[in-house]
Amino acid sequence: MSRHRRPQGFNRTDRVADQIQRELSRLLQFEMKDPRVNLATIQDVTVSRDLSYAEVYFTLLGQGEEAGAEAEEVLTKASGFLRSSLAQGLNTRTTPKLRFHYDMTPERAAHLSQLIDEARAEDRELRPEDDETGNNE
């Protein structure tokens, strides 16, 4: 048995996904000139076991769903350029085809947080005596 075991969950596809994420982030920051993707952040990349596809999840700082859909379209159209640029840095026989997905998780989280804050404020208005006595159930 080898003394140098790789940690669980860090197999070849994980390493390739990590490398793709880093390289795509660099490409978006320095190589893409389209302003619709300037604020895009690569959140996650998952690669198929045979390395034929990479699912790329991104967010846009301070943008809405409409801007996200537009950026997804731009990135999809630029996927050929991005894939060929990736091929130069990846140490694989083939370069995965890129599929871009706008990740709405941050917007959903902010919306849920806002709803919770509003509900708590409304609850405080309806039961102000709890705030005075410190009886928060």
Swiss-Prot record:
Q: Which GO terms describe its biological process?
A: maturation of SSU-rRNA
Where does the secretion signal sit in this chain? none
Skewed-composition ranges (Acidic residues): 128-137
Q: Which Gene3D superfamilies match?
A: 3.30.300.20
Question: Where along the chain is composition biased (Basic and acidic residues)?
Answer: 117-127
Please list the GO terms describing molecular function: ribosomal small subunit binding
Q: Which SUPFAM superfamilies match?
A: Ribosome-binding factor A, RbfA
Task: Give any Pfam family that matches.
Answer: RBFA
What does UniProt give as GO cellular component?
A: cytosol
- Region annotated Disordered sits at 114-137
| Key words, A-Z | Cytoplasm, Ribosome biogenesis
Show the InterPro entries listed in the entry. Answer: KH_dom-like_a/b, RbfA, RbfA_dom_sf
Localization of this protein: Cytoplasm
Quaternary form? Monomer. Binds 30S ribosomal subunits, but not 50S ribosomal subunits or 70S ribosomes.
What function is annotated for this protein?
Answer: One of several proteins that assist in the late maturation steps of the functional core of the 30S ribosomal subunit. Associates with free 30S ribosomal subunits (but not with 30S subunits that are part of 70S ribosomes or polysomes). Required for efficient processing of 16S rRNA. May interact with the 5'-terminal helix region of 16S rRNA.
The text of the family note is: Belongs to the RbfA family.
Name of the molecule in the record: Ribosome-binding factor A
**What is the species listed in this Swiss-Prot or TrEMBL entry?**
Alcanivorax borkumensis (strain ATCC 700651 / DSM 11573 / NCIMB 13689 / SK2)
* Protein encoded by which gene: rbfA
